[in-house]
Amino acid sequence: MKTVYLIHENRNWSEPLEDALNKIGVPYVDWYMVDRVINMATSPPGGIFYNRMSASAHSRGHRYCPELTTGLLAWLESNNRRVINGSSALRLELSKMVQYSTLREVGIKFPRTVAATNAKGILEAAQFLKYPIISKPNRAGKGLGVKLSYNENELKNYIHSIQLSIN
């Protein structure tokens, strides 16, 4: 039986999976990305790699885990390893713009969306939309930073009262 490598940064998510794998006798290795070293001068081990990296890792103090995992997945894929939720899945996870572009490609409708990178940009972007506006960080998690603003003053007050997302 092949070994499953669990790629993640959140033990709360991995523990139930580990329990289930133990229950059915599937061997696994915990690749906790918070303190992982990747020696790209070697070939990765054989097995199945299951990626559970989250774009909201920074909200748990794990700021660079998604970037490290991006490199890890490239290494695994370039070595023809079987990866579940590989680089294309992580690319979707890390970018609302990529998510919306993909939804558009497959014909799924979503609310009119404008992207911005800072407070000034958010206010400029709001000019292209009609109130009420829902603002949502690109990477936050658990609904953090999602806000409904009914007018420009509410939006201004909100964006000046928060720490903007990492991107």
Regions found by a protein language model. Name each.
Residues 1-5:
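Extreme N-terminal starter segment of soluble prokaryotic enzymes
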Residues 80, 88-167:
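Active-site nucleotide/adenylate-binding loops and adjacent lid/helix of ATP-dependent enzymes
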